[in-house]
Amino acid sequence: RVGQTATSGQQAARYGQVSPQQVAGLEQQYAAPSAVNVDRGRMTYDDVIMRTAAMFGVIVAVGALTWNLATSPATSGIGMMVMMAGAIGALVLGLVNSFKREPSPVLILAYAACEGAMLGAFSGVMELAYPGIVLQAVLGTLAVFAVMLAAYKVAGFRVSGKAARILLLAMGGYLIFSLVNFLLMVTGVVSDPWGLRGVTVAGIPLGLVIGALAVVMAAFSLAMDFESIQRGVERGLPTRYAWAGAFGLTVTLVWLYVEILRILAILRGDD
């Protein structure tokens, strides 16, 4: 009977009919879950979240070390040197990672380490001068992130076309200003601890105006990051591109945090 069943099955298939064995096989295939990105080695939202968490893990770990260096009287000088080295390293690696065709996890995590070195020391010094300011900056950053995510998901807020080009030009101009300001501070041309940001115009520190514009630019950049990540997932990009999404998101969040921290410091410094 087994032989007859097999033969009849072959004959049925040969004449375009479906045998009982084929029916069972098809039912199993239809019952199986459809292939998702993770099954095909494609980028998923979870991939981006995990890699972003890894980057912030590195930032926090390294930042804790440089925080202690910068806030300890015995090692504060070393802490400042590490902060400067971290800032330069983050700038260089940030540019390298931005222009690489393929994301490099090693270089991206190295960038996170440099950011941690800079952020830890900078945050520690600010916390010593203005207790509670770091928590305020963190909460402010999270609030902006939550608002922009809600605007993107619920209200359909997008930054594209002409608006995106204007934003990129504005960010380029801001980068040039920041580099010039940094050089003026390092060389001692400007004595104010905030550099050109400490200049007062009509009684208002220039740093507040520039900082507010920077926060708006960073917030809009978050929307662009969200859209870039969504496109990557929908197009089924390889998993390695989740590192690119995590890198872009981390860069924007760090920028946003620094700007909010600086604004708060300027405001509290005027008290």
Regions inferred by a protein language model and the residue ranges of each:
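A hydrophobic alpha-helical transmembrane-helix feature that marks the membrane cores
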Residues: 1-271
